[in-house]
């Protein structure tokens, strides 16, 4: 709760006064540190069985995960309804898996992660009709950083505090789901963040300096409208996130085949914007 209060206060100040990147980073570290001090930390990682973290590494890694999640969601919030749609779908996949763990395996931490995921779904679903193109209400840094923090919190509660040894029944992939699933849920924002950092640092600019070369900007340049661009990026998020979840319930070859077909379908949709189809008909 303290971490959420800090991030909300930071977001309000940023939305009102436009804080510089170092100041925002310090505030985000304080929020992540407060969350870690309250016990929401990575205790172990599902690497070669169970790799237990020492207290210092646990806190530092937790802060890093929270910072990445906050800024990934914050950077992807560039179109009406985009951040809310991606987080809602990603939280839906996380809810499905954490609910399964809390009911089938009785993990208390999974139950808390389920609650946070359900809250995120409700927050985004209630906000989205007002934030859809043409938006009447905007999320701002306050909202995007808050839902990024909550995504990180639910992921940490499942990834680093649920022992993977009891999940898989001897099969390998489901044991890695607690660490794979958070990455898959934030795959689109994380990819956008990574490309932005590489792009800006290569140009000698700050990684936090704004530009018009994000994934959603590229979709707009291809000829998609804002609504279609949001739907395409949300579809990719849902495909990757629910594809990861499905590995716990169906044979991996079925998941792989379905995901591959989905990627082809969504990529074809993304590379065939309306203006290109109109041009093809007129030529």
Where do the PLM segments sit?
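Alpha-helical transmembrane segments
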Residues: 1-9, 82-283
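Hydrophobic mid-bilayer segments of alpha-helices in multi-pass membrane transport proteins
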Residues: 25-30, 259-261
